[in-house]
Structures are given as C-alpha cells and as structure tokens.
C-alpha cells in the first residue's frame, strides 16, 4: 500500500445543498433534538493527534467538533483544519504515549482553545440563546447562519464557524456544579461503565442479524454469556459471525491490492475459523490492525500466552466486540444494507458520492443503527415509503395481522437465503423463511399464528428500532456539563462525553425515568437546557399527559429574567406548546413523599407507558444462563446461500456450452438440473465439524427449494441438501455416535478429544508403529479419553501424527514454508503494529505515522525487523522449534545441524517444513483454541477425498476414462519394500487393456501362478483407498467382542449366505476369478463384497458396514459391539414370568361386575363378519375372538405396543400441543430448565438424545426405548408408558451393560422358577390364559357392535386383555363367595384380579368411559382371571418387577364385595362406585357381612370380625384361641410363630439376606465365607489378648472365675489355654481369666455354629455355592444326624436347640 499524501491545511468545508438548508430551517421550530442526521462517531471528539506537514514540522492538534462528515482540528499554532475520519484514525495518539514534553504542549493547546472560545462569546453573544446543544452521539447538528455565502469559504471563516459549532464541547466546567442524578437502576448485571458498550453491541447484532447470520437472542442471555467464565455457544457464535464478516472484507481488500489485508490473510488460514479456533484469529486480527496497543491491553496480551479468552473481564470483552462491530461497518454487504434502508426511508440522494472501500475506515457509533424487520430493496420508490413504515411498525409491535396490498402480505423469498420454495410466513412481519434456514421443526409449528425469531425476540427483549431503522437510539440533548442523554433499548442512557470529564455512564429503566425528569426540572441553573431535555424524554416515552412542565415554565421565566428577557423565538414557541399541554394536577404538584415511588405517582397514563413499564420490570442479570443452550440456526441459511451461489456458477457454466441440443427433452433437462444441484450441494457440504454430546450438528428439516423439496407432498424423496450434508459427514457421525460420553467432561475439550479419536479410527491401516498392536492402542485411547487439560492432549496428538504414514498426508505437509512466514513481520514492526506514533523522548522531532511494509523487501531485511517476545512467538511461532529438537541441539552445542531443517546453500536462514512448524505449534499451545487450530491443520493436511471409494454418479464422465473407472475392480495383492520405497502389486481383474497414463507408471509386470498379471506400482500412483484397504486387512486389530467364536469356524447364517451365492455357479466362478466374491447382506438382503463385510455380534451374519451400528464401551477396556439393523429392530423379548409367593389362604372366587374397555390399537372386525368366519362350536364363550387386521403393518404394531398413540386419519387434532409439551428433541434449547431422566435406564439427561413424556406417571423415556423413530414423531399424538399400560417395559438401548445383564439374569431365574413350579395358565409374554371350553354364556351378546369397527383397537401384547375364548365365565349362580375346599392345598392358587383398561383416543384425552355392557347383559360381564404364585418373592422386590406395585391388591380389598354393577371411571383412571360416589375402598375397613363365613364354625351370622393380615384367615373373635389387642392388626397363631422364627434368627443369615441377584456361584461362596472369617479373626484376637492379660499380675483385680469345663469342649482352645495359663490352672475347679477370653470364646462358638452346612447359614450358603443345592441337602442331613448324636453323648444341648430353631423352616 502506498503512503497517503497528507491533505493541505485549511481545507474549506463542504458546500451545503440548498434543499438541505431549507429542510433544516423548516424543521427548526419543531422537535429539533429528534430531527438530526443519522448516528455518527463520538469516539474521535476531544482526542489529540500529531501530524507531520511538508515543512518537516510535527504539530499537536485537538479534535473539537464534527459536521457533515468532517472533523475540525485546532493545532497549537492557532491554525485549524477539517479532516475525514479516515485521515484521523492513523494520527490519533492516546494518553499513554504522551511524554513530559507533549503534556506541556497539550496544556498550552487547551489554553489556546479556551481563549478562542471566550473571544467568540464576546463577539457573538446572541448565538448562545439561539444555538441549543444538539449533538447526537457526538455529532453536532449543522446550525444555519446568515453569514454563509454558499460559494466559498476562507480559512478564517471556516475556523470561526467551526469554533462556534464546537464551543459547547471545550468550555471548562462552570462554577455551578452539575446536577446530581439519581443512581442507576441496576437492572443490567454488568458494571456501569460497560453498559454503553453492551447496548451498542447488542443493538448492532440485532440490527444486522440477517447480514451476519446471527440468530436473535435476548439481552439477558447476552449478559449471562459475557459473565460466564467458560466456553459458551452464544459468545462463540457472535465472535465467529463477526470474524467471518471481517474475513470477507479482508478478501475484498486483498483483491484490491491491499498489502496489509493480503498479509493478514496469508499469515493464517481463515478457512479454519470455527467455534473453537476463533480466539486465535481474534488475536491475530487485533495484532495486525493495531487495536491491542496500549497498557490497557496488557491483559489481552496475557490471554494470548497464559489464560483463556473467556476469563477476560467483561469490560474487556465488550471493548473487543465494540471494535469488531466498528470495523464491520466497512463490509460491503453491510454498507449496501445501510444504503438500502436509507434510500427506502429517506429517499435517494443523487449527489451522494460512493466512498471507495479502501478509504472507508471503522466508525465507532453510540448507539448503533437499528434493524428494520421489513427489508426494502433499492427499487422501492418514495411513494411506497409510507407503506413500508406501516409494515415496519407492524413487525416491531407484533400486534396486528393486517396485510399489505399483496395477496398474502409476505415475501416470496426466504429472508435469509433469498431462495423461493416452500416458505414459512410470519404473522407479525412481512417476511418468510425456509424452516431449515431458521431451525424450526415443522412438527412444533402451532396451528394458529406463528411468529419468526425476530418478532419473538422483539416481544421479549427491549425494542431496538425507534421510528426509523437507521437509528438505534434517540438523543434528547446535552447539558452544559457535557452529559449526553440518550434513549436506547428502552433505557435512558447518560454519557459524559466532555473532554476533561470522567467517562461516567448511568442508565435508567422506565420506572426510574420520572426520577431523572424530576431532578432535572428542579435544577436551579441551566433551566432552559434541562427543560428541552425533559420535554424530549416526556414525548419519547409517552409519559401521561397529566405530567406537565409547570415547574419548568417557572424555571424558564427565571431564566428569562436573568438574561434580561433575551429569549429566542424558538424557545417561546416551545414553552407555549408545553403550557398548552399542561393540566391542573400534575406529578410535580404531588407531595415530596410520593416521589420515592414513581410507579404509584405516575398513573393514568397512556397504554404505551404501561406496556413499557411492564417490560421494565425485567432485569438483565444473566442468572439463568446456560452455556450450551443457544444454537445459531442462521448458519443453516448461510449454507443455503453458499449452495445457491455454487448452483448459480454451475448453471452459468452449463449455459455457455455450445451443445444445447442435449436438453431437447424435458426429462433430460430435469435430469441435468438434478445433477447440477447434486454437484453444487456436494461442493459446499462441510465435511468437518466438531462433535458434541448434544448433537447440534444434526439438521432435520428440508431446505424447501431443491428439486426433491419442490415435488408434491406425496413424494418420499429426501432433501438433496440434507443428503449432501449427511453424505459428507456419514462416516464421522457413525464413529462419533459411540464415543460419548467421554471421561473428560462435556466441554470443548471433549470435542477435541473425540475428533482425535476419530482421526485414529478413520486412518486405520495408514497408521504404523504401536497402533498396530491392541494393547498400546488401548492405552493411547484411554489417555485421550481421560485427558482433562489441554496439556494432556498434546502428547497423544503428537504421537498420532508421528505414526501416520506419509502417503496419507498431502505434499504441502513436508514443504519448506518459512520463506513466506518471514514476510509477515508486520506484526513485529513497531510502527505498523501500533498504527500511531510511538512515545517520543526528548530531542526526537518526528516519526513517520504511516509506515508500510514493502513487498519487495528482502528476507534478510524483513527478518531484522523482528523484535521477538512471547506475543510474536505465540502468534507466528517465529524461530520456534519443537522441544526434542531444541534439547538435542543444546546438548550438541550447535555443532551439528538440526534434523528437519533445510539450511540451503545460498541463504543463511534455515527453513522449517510445515510438519516441523506444526509440531512446534502444538507444543507451544497454551489454551484450547490454539490446540484446536492445530488439530484442524492436521485434518486439513490429510487426503480425505482419496480415503474412500469415490461415487461415480457425481463424477464428470466427459473426456477420457477416469482413474475411478480404471481402478473400479482393482485390488492390491502384494507389497514389497526396496531402497526405502514401497511398491504394491495391483491386480486389475478382467481388465486387459490399461490406458497409457497408467502403463507408464508400471515398474514391473509379474505373472502369478493362476496366470494372472500383477502390476507393480509405486505407492504414489496407487489410489489411497486401495492402500488403506490392503494395509487394514494385513494389520487388522481384532476388536473384542461379546461373542467368542473360533476365527476359522463360520456360523450357520454365514454358511447359508455363502451357499446362496453358489446358486449361480457361473457368476460365482467369475467373481472368484476377479476376487469379487459376494453374498447377500444379512440385514438388507442386497449383495455385498466379502472383503467389505462386517460380522454382526448378534446373528453372526455378513452385513454391509452401513447396515450396522457400532457401540463402544470404555469400562476399563475398549469393548465394541457391532449390531445389524435387523437384529436391532427385531430383538426378541426375554420371556419373563412373574412368580409371587404361594398363597396359603383359602381360595375365594369373586364375581366382579365391571366395565370392559379396550385400547384402540388394533382394528377389530365387526361381529357380523366374524360370525360367518368362525364355527359356533369353537366360539363357546359367546364372545368374538380378536384378530389383528392385516392392514396394520408389523412395524407399526411393534411400535404401538410400547404405548405410542398415533394420529388417525380424518381427525382434527394434529397433536401439536402434545409434541410441544411432551417431546424433547435432541439439541432443543427452548426448554433449558428441563433435564429429564429416562425412566428405564435411569441415566442422566443427555442433550443429544430425544425424550418422550408419559402423561400419566409423569416420567420421561428415550424415544429409542419405545421404538419411536425421529421420522415418526410428527405422527405422534399421545403416549402412555408400558407400566401405565400394565405391559412389560422394553430395554433401553442406552442402559448400562451391567444393569442390563442383571435384568436378564433376573428374567432367566424368574422363568426357570416358573417352569419348575408349574404354569398357572397365564404366560406373561403371550398373555393368553388356558382355554375353558365348559363356560357358556347365559345370554347372547347384542348383535350390533358396541364400537364402530374403525375405532376399536386391541394391542397384541397387553396382558390385561386376554383372549375372551380362554376366560372362565362366571355365571349368576356362582355370584356369591364360595369357600374352596382346597384352601391349604399346596401348589399355585387362583385369585382373580380386577382391572380396568382405559380407552386411548386420538386426542390424548381420557374422558369418562361409558358402560359397554347393556343393562340386560350386565350379568355376563367377564372378569379377568389370573393366577399369582408368590413363592419367589424373596428374590425380587417391587422395583425388579415388570408391573407396578399397584397390581398386588391386599386381601381386604379383594374380599370387599362389589355390588355396584359396574363402576365408572374418572379421567385419571380411578374407579368411582356408582352407588356411593364418596366411597373409597381402603385396607383399614372392617369386614362386612357378605365377606364370607367363619372358617372355624362356618357360620355367617354373626359376621366374622377377625381377619388375619398375613394369611387372610377369617374367623369370629369367640372362635379364635388367640388373643386380639384392640386397635392393632391381628394375625393368627401360625403366622405369629413364623414371625417369631424369623425374628429369633438373629445374625444367622437374617441380616445378611441377598438383596440382588449374584452373577455366579463363586461370588456366593466368597460372600458367605467373608463374614465368618472376619468374625473368627476378631474372636481369636480377643481370645489371645484375654489369655495374655490373664497372666499379668496387674490385671488380677479384673479377672473372673469360670468353670474349667468351659475349655474342655474344644481341643484347639484347650491347647491354647493350657499353653498360656498352665496345666495346673486348667485342672482346677475354676479358672481365673480375663473377660476378653469369654467374649472371644462366645464369638468363636457363634462363628462355628454359623458355619454349619445347613439351611440359610453361611456354611449352608457356601456349600450350595460350591457344590449345588442337592449337595446342601446331603450335608444338611448329615449335620442333623451328627448333632443329634452329639447331644445324646455330651452335656451341651445348645447345638440341638440351634438346629431346631434354624433348620425348622428351611
């Protein structure tokens, strides 16, 4: 870039147009503070600058005013000049660069400017009353004076006029102190000094959200993102959007031969900018542009070396965002948008001169331009301006649904991508969108009005646009003390912009604005200025008309008296307008006590102020912010824009081809259009993405404008754009699905670790070294998975790159590249880095202000500019080597050359390769963003396009035969290494003629034994995918599988597949010749090459790799399970039979009349059709058997059995409300507070999975657990889980493998027990009871069906609805209770269970069911009879059961008579007895008269009054031999004995019951022996210590006397005691021992009894675990005999008592 020639001093002001002057004169008497030019910068006012003139003199100047794009500068010699902002930006200096000399010169300059101001006041005193402070954001509205001639201006005239305009800025603070304003409202949770930057940046991002592709967000979330000290998606998306816009701007500048922009782009690859690497680009951009200069940016430089960007102070973050937003104002797209808005609202300016991009510089604006929702193109004329404003106001308010003169009032193109197609029209603004561009799921679109994201945020957040889309804030005026009053984002902002004042910022919400107005109007000085400010504030916020400015009028009168009545006409007219609006009672007339509460003082206002007050109650503290909930859906629109642009380029290339006859038919034209779209979409489809646990990269919606999306709704073709994106990421998605969750958390570090694992998995076959063996590979993967810091990931990444074969990397990875890096020394050049003159020392007179780096400078000269330092090393990694190379060179003392460096012959500067540079960059990475960038560099250097077989459908088939076609049947059959060069032997199959370009690369042709030719080629000339397949087959790592099978033995299914391939013998022989053996895939039944197959872990069949899913578990070891789709969808349920305790109570047969209801799942034929198809003799029950209709698909029946209710045809309810409330999609961020837990697998919430909610039990489940696919979600209208439906719950695929294995073991044990004890007639899987053909109906059923045939459905696997042909009919004769004669007989007893089944309607509502049995047929109501065996209850608790505990009714409830004749049901399913609605059956009710006779005397009168709560025995109190306590539960004598036996067991097994299923018998042995061994060790210790203390003389007083026979019962204890106490002591009558001896003896005795191999003692359990149950019986009998004999021959009767006590109930 050439140095700019400085402008001559004394440049005249721009000439004003006459119509502009007339417009300002006409508007002068009106609301002047609002009629100003668009917002312009304020940051340059009051700044100091140094400028070098042609006479080699450097003058210090000060910017004093601004007018019509020009800044007035006064120099220290008294001269002045008007410059543009582009010239000033490079000349401004900050306070940190002022030395003592410059400070003295600055003070003299300030005095000179002050003298000019005083002289101007004396010469023109009338201007003080006429000119009011009218600056907006530091912009002074042009005051029209009568002295202007309009033709030419001298230097002195321009200086004086400029001084008049800037007089209000440089006046020193008057003697009267400024008015003390109330404190800020405190509703924004950031420091006050940063509020201005916050509102400015937020308004800018909201105003240009479409141009920047930033999905709108609330101010509260923005504050939370700034405060969050870790990575968050909102802050990442904002920075990425801003930097991408700047990237395009730099590219345009580079194309215009801008040296600075070119070097900024060449220093770092901007194509790698993403949500993880953007901090590196931010540092590089700020350093290149000189933004991070000055001591206040030291913490920013520290971030580059040490800390993360997110930990910066919130003020620093906002300053960085402010600078980025300022620089984006020069982006071409943004300037076009601003011009279009200005043209549509203000009108086209024919005299406007377009400023070149090179001369545009960032403008800092306070506040920003605001956005308009209805974007108008440049063709909009002045006549349609009013209509556009009406549409704007309708969008902003979002209230009315009026439409314009168009048909629907909405645009015909998507607002984001600009394409037509299927659009979603907003009801709040005239915009339309593709659902994919804004990330809206169609199933969640309500039936009523729908509002776009912009309108939704406008309703929630503060208002950005105010009357015009070119102004984001309204300026109310500036007081004499330099405080500017602004209205923005529904807040009053007060900025101190005076040169000598402090940067004080205060803000007030709507509730506090009245306080500010009261304080200003009560000021004793400068009343005139404050009245104008208060008037503008009152008008802007629509304060109630009852609030007048009466006190302001009094202040005006006093001001007039002080100024001798010299008031301008404008002031008089304004005060007259104010007085006309006043009323008798105002807010200022209220007492002082009411001023403290402005909400109660300001009443009776308009609706506008009330609405704003409601909005003002919202605080923006960011307390509820969650870091990963925001999802920038507008990036989908950016992808669509790129796809449309690529398609346009391809279409233009096709139209320029001369052969136009190829489109002679519409079919060929459509085919060509489809091919063009496929090519265009494939070019822009991103291959790379950072994996995340919440799967935000998943896009479900269609684009709306491709060829497939434009077809009719009946077409089942998928979206072509989605297909291209899915094809580009298909391999990565398959691997990523099994990686999460990793052990290093859910942050960005886990994404980097997951991608490193993906690189290793994708390059299998092209990685050598330790990755070829399984054990080192496992250790490496474990190291990556457990890495918790950035430093921990460096070593695995470097190890991975070190072992990648060079053939898999591009050639640029090994090229020398330091030659162009040295050119980028601009970042270390002091003049260019700072962009302003450096600090000047004494005697230094000048320095060039615009130093440019010349491109023709030599490398040596460029290198001498480099200053070194940590900052430059981190940014550009100059002169940085990897640590191993540096240490080795240091040990050698510099005597040898460093390996990996190219020293060359002509240059003395060694050059590094890209690989060496990358290694040094990885080792010097200090934060996550730097490491992520290096991962992306490595990923970019891999030859991804050649790793997979290319798709020939998208290849350009024109011209000669492509390499893809040549190698389509080729395979590598051999490999050899000679002279460190690798060659491969390629077999081309049946291809006999090869092109010349292939033959010239052939090194040797070798004949094989089967007379085939093997062509030897170097590895560089062989396709990479062939090398990968060959190397992977040679060094295939056997992944551990759950099914261990001999490698040489084929399964039955594999043999069947291979046998089927032999049916066509000729094709098989040809395939064997070409090594192309095929077989049918076990999943999809299509052909698959045997070399490309993978084996399913379940069915052991050959399958496509795409037909399988891989799941990895890292519980200590890497465990990979490969499951084909067929096995995953058709997993057979393990039969589970619920065995319960065997009932010993008398059997009661209870005839219960109830309503039969069915669940609408499977259609039922009308009875008339079934009667004709069935024989009368087979249908003995008189009820039609239910058969599923064939029209219902099998897949749908399987899904229906899990409780999903589908949408029916011709039903108005679409289920939108149910899906909005009860289905939580993966990555959905509109419900951040909802984190459900799956009710089956009990795993914590995973944002990457979809959940569905049961409306009955309020539990959530994974959609995969209920067999619900994502494509079927739009058809769901309801859901009720399996437990609520009383069916067996399926297994969740995300269940912990250990928990899943335990459940399977329980089911197997459950099934085995049921089979041993005998089936009671009800199978829990088939859910059908044994047929009872002897039951005949007494009354036939009605001929007409009770339900319409289309509305009656019955699930196949509902256990509550058994086959009616197999239900025992209860006739009226057996209505009363009957006492079974086999009450205490062994075996399973029958007990009927009463259940009610609710009907599921399509609208997911449950109205009150009506009886389906007519009154005359009530007695034929069939109860459901089931049998319950309770013998296995000790092994299971209710949590292990397949049904809920409510299924097990108490005997009191079951014995309660039900004479209601069929109760009705509420909506929640609870039964209400029709006879007495207030009756609620409980377990504490007393027995009624009709419960049954006494089981002792068999008498019904009087009624039995005692009921055993355990066994259900019903007797009279006078017949009972057992006593009964009043008010307590009663149990019979046998149950009391059982309870007594279980209580007296004590520690013998009672407190060591197994609460869960043991995995194997060895575990049972270990557990059984652990307790006795521990007790024996403790007892022996106590016994030994006690014996030792017994011999001590000091412990004589603690000894006790015991009989000596105590030690004669055990040989071991007797010998130990004899050795310790002596022979004489043990032969005496009594022995003196310590009490610890007795305690140890008792413990050993107890342990010995506990080890007896009988019953449930630990010894019995150990024997059972070691030898089995039959061995325990043998050991038990032998123990009983031996104990009996021991009791007869010895004095101890304790063993026999223990035997009676323990073994009696086993």
UniProtKB/Swiss-Prot annotation:
Membrane topology label: Multi-pass membrane protein
Basic residues compositional bias, start-end: 1-16
Gene Ontology molecular function terms on file: methylated histone binding; zinc ion binding
Transmembrane segments: 1539-1559, 1569-1589, 1596-1616, 1624-1644, 1682-1702
Any single GO BP term: chloroplast-nucleus signaling pathway
Lineage: superkingdom: Eukaryota
Keywords: Chloroplast, Membrane, Metal-binding, Nucleus, Plastid, Plastid outer membrane, Repeat, Transcription, Transcription regulation, Transmembrane, Transmembrane helix, Zinc, Zinc-finger
GO cellular component: chloroplast envelope; chloroplast outer membrane; ISWI-type complex; nucleus
Biased composition, class Acidic residues, residue ranges: 148-160
Protein name: DDT domain-containing protein PTM
Polar residues bias locations: 394-408, 1167-1194, 1311-1323
Biological classification of the source: Eukaryota, Viridiplantae, Streptophyta, Embryophyta, Tracheophyta
Pfam families linked: Chromo_PTM, DDT, Peptidase_M50, PHD, PTM_DIR17_Tudor, WHIM1
Gene name as annotated: PTM
Location relative to the cell: Plastid, Chloroplast outer membrane; Nucleus
